């Protein structure tokens, strides 16, 4: 199994890079993980709803074009299914047993396009809270690492 994180946005603040890199390095012994940073559509100051929809469509096309044919697409969005860490660990164990490669899509500041939502095998919510997409990167990689540590009896998860 391989995990690819398809994320909109290429210039992250230093605190995001620091937090993400820590867990990204930790997860590698458990599962091959890759991050694909895709360009965010250029936004204006007073964008209309039509403009925002267009930006989401452009970003959605980037996500779908980056998707490999054998990958299961999972859309991260506030309206998705919530999982406990233990349920995520079970889900990841199943992916590994089935040999599934997984692509996790993180949208830009305006979310994911309808095309990405429709293409996704399922939708996952890290929280009912709305979060900035740079923070989602850190939360996602930490939860993936935590789930893998459960599956490998590593002492990181102590809940």
UniProtKB/Swiss-Prot annotation:
EC number: 2.1.1.177
Record bears the keyword rRNA processing: yes
GO molecular function, one term: rRNA (pseudouridine-N3-)-methyltransferase activity
Pfam family, one: SPOUT_MTase
Superkingdom assignment: Bacteria
Coiled coil location: none
UniProtKB keywords: Cytoplasm, Methyltransferase, rRNA processing, S-adenosyl-L-methionine, Transferase
GO cellular component terms given for this protein: cytoplasm
Amino acids binding S-adenosyl-L-methionine: 76, 107, 126-131
Reactions catalysed, as given in the entry: pseudouridine(1915) in 23S rRNA + S-adenosyl-L-methionine = N(3)-methylpseudouridine(1915) in 23S rRNA + S-adenosyl-L-homocysteine + H(+)
Purpose: Specifically methylates the pseudouridine at position 1915 (m3Psi1915) in 23S rRNA.
PANTHER family cross-referenced by the UniProt entry: METHYLTRANSFERASE, RIBOSOMAL RNA LARGE SUBUNIT METHYLTRANSFERASE H
Family: Belongs to the RNA methyltransferase RlmH family.
Name of the protein: Ribosomal RNA large subunit methyltransferase H
């Amino acid at each position: 199994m391989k995990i690819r994180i398809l994320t909109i946005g290429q210039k992250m603040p230093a605190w995001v890079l620091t937090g993400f890199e820590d867990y990204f390095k930790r997860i590698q012994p458990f599962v091959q993980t890759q991050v694909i940073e895709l360009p965010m559509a250029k936004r204006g100051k007073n964008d209309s709803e039509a403009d925002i929809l267009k930006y989401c469509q452009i970003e959605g096309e980037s996500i779908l074009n980056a998707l490999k044919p054998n990958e299961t697409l999972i859309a991260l969005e506030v309206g998705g299914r919530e999982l406990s860490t233990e349920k995520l660990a079970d889900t990841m164990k199943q992916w590994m047993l089935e040999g599934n490669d997984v692509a996790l899509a993180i949208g830009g500041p305006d979310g994911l396009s309808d095309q990405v939502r429709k293409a996704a095998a399922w939708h996952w919510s890290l929280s009912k809270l709305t979060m900035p997409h740079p923070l989602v990167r850190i939360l996602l990689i930490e939860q993936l690492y935590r789930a893998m540590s459960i599956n490998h009896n590593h002492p990181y998860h102590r809940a």
